[in-house]
Structures are given as structure tokens and as C-alpha cells.
């Protein structure tokens, strides 16, 4: 169980800042910061992929294959994609590709790419009917 650090009431509900394993937190939607290959090979995304089980990796690989047929990355920087949560205790899983601070080619556009990533995230959230609680790590 995660430890609650800060709780704030806001116009649309409650915001909680927590520390712990987000894959075990109750919520309707889990958001994971992903790379543009949707590979789930490092950081929070790796933990999410491991908790979701091998079906998630197979599913994201299928997305990658289909997008590459159109000469597109599986999920471009600033984009988000919804997948089933598989073994996770959430209704939906959203993968969001934010800018990579390790890539100098993204330095000049980092703020715009981050804004685009959050905008895409909120668009995907709007597509999900059951969205009462969102588990969202920093992107």
C-alpha cells in the first residue's frame, strides 16, 4: 500500500500525492510513462509491464507492428495510447510518451512535447467511460 504524502481538495474532487507501488493502487485508470516503442523496458513502465503480465507486451508489440506498417513509431513523443490492463487491478491502462531528458535533440522542444503529452493523455482519459480515479505518476 502506498503512503499518502499530501491530500488536497479541488473543484473536481481530491488530489493525493503518494509514494509506493502504483501498480497496486486502486483506481479506474493507470497511466504509465512509456517510450516511443511501447517496450516497457525501463523505469515505471517496466514495473507496469511486469505487473500486467506477458499479455501486455504482446499487445503493445501488436500496436507497434500495425503502426510500423504505416511508417509510424508505435507511439510518438507527445502521444498516448490506451490498452487493456491485463493483470493490473485497473479498468484501463494509458501509455504516454513524454520527452526524454536524455535526448539532446528534444532539448529545444521539451516544454511543447510535454504539453502535447499531457494533452494527449487527457484526450485518452476523455475516451474512457469509467474514469473516477486516475493513478498518474509524473511523466
State the predicted function of each range.
Residues 1-139:
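Macrodomain-like recognition of ADP-ribose-binding/processing modules
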